[in-house]
A protein has these predicted regions:
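Conserved phosphate/metal-binding and DNA-contacting active-site motifs used
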Residues: 1-176
Length: 176
């Protein structure tokens, strides 16, 4: 499964739960790991969860919604839900090439921003609660790479969404 994510152009890393299992994983925000890296990592961590390293290499950033407050922060916002997590959702967006986003815990109530130097857990990983991570909207590039693999998803196949203006404005306010 990890190789399929890599074939899709997504920078990946093995996770112990939600914690990266390799010490130098952050460098893969700017470069994709090699197939040799991935082979060694999963040989050393055969039961690891799978994570996407956010940033330029993968071309994505993620809003990580957890708990009760997250849905309230997004109540009147239009977002493409993409992954159901054990305790919320991940909303994936194409990373604009001209931006320097920073990770932010509590970006909005119940929402964390995961970007360059951040990572998120992806299907078919399991949450500590036992719940499986499931794609709601399977990214188009991943669907092509996974054509011969059965990956759980419940909705449609689309490219990563462009971030809406309101979200880019909120992110810009972080830098002020």
């Amino acid at each position: 499964m990890a190789m399929a994510y890599l074939r899709a152009g997504l920078s990946i890393n093995p996770l112990n739960g939600k914690v990266p299992a390799v010490p130098d994983w952050t460098k893969f925000a700017h470069q994709l790991p090699t197939t040799d890296h991935v082979s060694v990592w999963w040989h050393e961590h055969p039961t690891a969860n799978l994570g996407i390293v956010c940033g330029p290499a993968s071309g994505v950033f993620v809003l990580d919604q957890d708990g009760e407050q997250g849905p309230q922060s997004l109540l009147l916002r239009e977002l493409p839900p993409t992954v159901k997590t054990g305790s919320g959702r991940h909303y994936y967006f194409a990373l604009p090439s001209d931006t320097q986003f920073k990770n932010a815990v509590g970006f909005l109530p119940g929402l964390d921003l995961r970007t360059t130097g951040g990572q998120v857990v992806v299907p078919p990983s399991r949450h500590a609660s036992g719940a499986k991570y499931v794609w709601d909207i399977l990214p188009e590039q991943l669907a092509r790479a996974l054509a011969d693999i059965d990956i759980p998803y419940e909705g449609e196949i689309q490219p990563f969404a462009e971030a809406p203006d309101w979200l880019l404005e909120e992110i810009a306010n972080l830098a002020k």
